């Protein structure tokens, strides 16, 4: 595998782990729902990044790709969106959604554990889900990433609109959010 790719995957893994620990610490200190959701999202991102690191260093395999795909494509963005929902709406809405998301996450993990693969993995070739999994894992990834990404984008736009409507010193923050929103779009 490419040394640069392996190095970047290692770096991303370590940065994600640090962010996961920082957000978990914030949740531990403040017990705010959005911190717990973001800690989960960053932990999933770290797991996916570590799987990528492992795969680029040693080669892709069935198990490594399942971990990478489950943590990164299926689960991560949904937990990130839950954090945005919790931040914008509060616990009355976020806590029931967290229970539902936990159940859906358990279902998705179960599907990914037992989903049959359609062809063997080539160790030094980045796998594509459509080449290895049937429809259900790919639908879970599409829904688990697409809908939450839309929620994150709409939440960011709603935050900008609220700041602009208030016309307070935070209005300057809204202009900064306008720059951050396209970055969130690319990241999701």
Give the positions of each predicted feature.
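Structural signature of hydrophobic alpha-helical transmembrane segments
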Residues: 3-15, 66-75
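Juxtamembrane loop-transmembrane helix junctions in multi-pass integral membrane proteins
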Residues: 2-6, 26-29, 33, 60-67, ...
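The cytoplasmic-loop to transmembrane-helix boundary for the fourth helix
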Residues: 85-132
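Alpha-helical transmembrane segments in multipass membrane proteins, preferentially the mid-helix core
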Residues: 18-24, 79-86, 138-171
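Internal transmembrane alpha-helix with an interfacial aromatic "cap," most often the third helix
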Residues: 19-27, 53-54, 60-61, 71-103
């Amino acid at each position: 595998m490419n040394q640069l790719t392996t190095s970047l995957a290692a770096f991303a893994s370590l940065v994600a782990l640090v962010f996961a620990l920082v957000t978990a610490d914030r949740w531990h200190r403040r017990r705010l729902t959005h911190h717990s959701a973001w800690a989960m999202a960053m932990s999933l991102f770290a797991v996916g990044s570590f799987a990528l690191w492992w795969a680029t260093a040693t080669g892709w395999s069935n198990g490594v790709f399942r971990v990478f795909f489950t943590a990164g494509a299926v689960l991560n963005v949904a937990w990130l969106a839950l954090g945005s929902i919790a931040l914008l709406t509060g616990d009355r809405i976020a806590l029931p959604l967290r229970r539902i998301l936990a159940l859906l996450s358990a279902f998705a993990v179960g599907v990914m554990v037992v989903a049959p693969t359609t062809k063997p993995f080539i160790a030094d070739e980045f796998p594509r889900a459509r080449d290895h999994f049937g429809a259900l894992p790919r639908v879970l990834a599409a829904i688990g990433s697409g809908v939450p990404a839309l929620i994150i984008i709409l939440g960011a736009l709603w935050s900008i609109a609220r700041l602009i409507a208030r016309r307070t010193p935070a209005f300057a923050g809204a202009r900064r959010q306008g720059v951050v929103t396209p970055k969130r779009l690319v990241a999701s």
